[in-house]
Amino acid sequence: MKYILSIILLSISFSQVFSSYDYLGSRATAMSAAITSGDHIESGIFHNPAQLSNNSNITIISGYSNLYGLDFLPLSHVGISKNNYALSFKNISTEFNGNTLSSETALGVAKGFNLYSDRQSLIQMGLRFNFYSYDFGESAGTEGDGSNGINLGSSNASGFDIGFQGVLNKKYYVAYYIKNISSYIEGSSLGLNLPKTMSIGLSYLPYKDLVTSLDINQLSGNKDSEIRFGIEYKLMESFKIRTGLQSNPNRFSAGFEFGNIKLANLYTCNFSYSFLTHHVLPTTHQFSLSVKF
């Protein structure tokens, strides 16, 4: 446990305070974040906003996980979409003995729209504005656990995302997504820019119930790209299975979704679970619940 904690503390010490987490949502976790391209509302709300373009429902999605299976690293998210607009919320914190040592919150507002469409092809675009807030918590104090420490303050930041997608015959998808293409951080102690990531996604649907996706993800300033591959297969109308692989680092993921349960003929519910391994740390487990009106 001390070894794991040391790794996390060292990684935090040498990284920017405002984090970049690509596996938000059960589907993204299960498919190793190979979700840049395709047609899925969860991916549109939390990732490439171009996938919001053809949405015509009201959807509410919420999820929770402890990163790497550690109780002191809780991650929660909520997303709401109506037509081609979406609102997303994410919170990740570090907690110890009931005290919050640090907390990061992200609020995003997104819109997707069609640039061009005909009988066979479609070109989509999406925009998202993100507002970030980071609370530094309190110092260790005389007790050493932060219970009576001094407030260390907070900081705010903002970022802008943009995504594009081309669709052919609703079977072939090519997408490009840039996160934090433009950003601003109050003050200068946290760095000049938010983490910027660029993703290229390819998806192919050989038939209606099977989705295969390939992503190439590049974090700005990192010379190595991440290659991600994901599969989603609908076994039956109410049950889907998902799996994925990633390189740099090597990770494996899988999960399922059980749903399309109609309640009072007003809305449908879906429950999903997924896990994602890590090359050093324990496995992350993700639970999500969605309601579609």
Where are each of the predicted segments found?
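Subset of outer-membrane beta-barrel
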Residues: 16-293
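Sec-dependent N-terminal signal peptides
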Residues: 3-13
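Positively charged n-region of N-terminal signal peptides that target proteins for export
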Residues: 1-4, 117-119
